[in-house]
Amino acid sequence: KVKMKTIVIATKNAGKAREYQDMLAPLGIEVKTLADFAPIAINENGKTFEENATIKATTAANQLQLPVMADDSGLMVDALGGAPGVHSARYAGDHDDAANNAKLLLALKEVPDEKRTAHFHTTIVGIKPDGTKLVANGRVDGHILHQLTGENGFGYDPLFYVDELGKSMAQLTADQKNQISHRGRALRSFMKQFNDWW
């Protein structure tokens, strides 16, 4: 049996960690998160998703001397010029889903359905302690709803209507979400290149 290898996901978000766990566990890889280690100061001041993910992964890989995967994800709303974008988690308040969702609804109050187009984007960056880097991207297209819909997921999921499924992201099962989500798609793209990187 192959010896368990460890990879660190640069997040403390349990929901996000679970999505990685589901994808990486079948490969016999032990998944840890930043919550398993002493605090690491990470200055996420990038202008793009890839810059932020690279900062997170590099900082953690250097400090922990383990391979690290980091992602930066965001919601890009066309009517808002691509906002909230890299500021998605901190749009109204720091990782306050309710406040962020309320601010988004308010910003789009007068915007008709056909102009409420949006997409979720994820960039995943893997960095090994020797600096070897792997980058993958994923996106899912949709529209912003007028009210919170569905009980699952986190973040903007209840406001994001997935065009190809005809449901909000928060109405999907975990399996359905993994199939179509921006993170699921970025992760599958990442996994296709994983062996070469690993």
Give names to the regions the model predicted.
Residues K1-K3:
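Short, Lys/Arg-enriched N-terminal segments with co-localized hydrophobic residues
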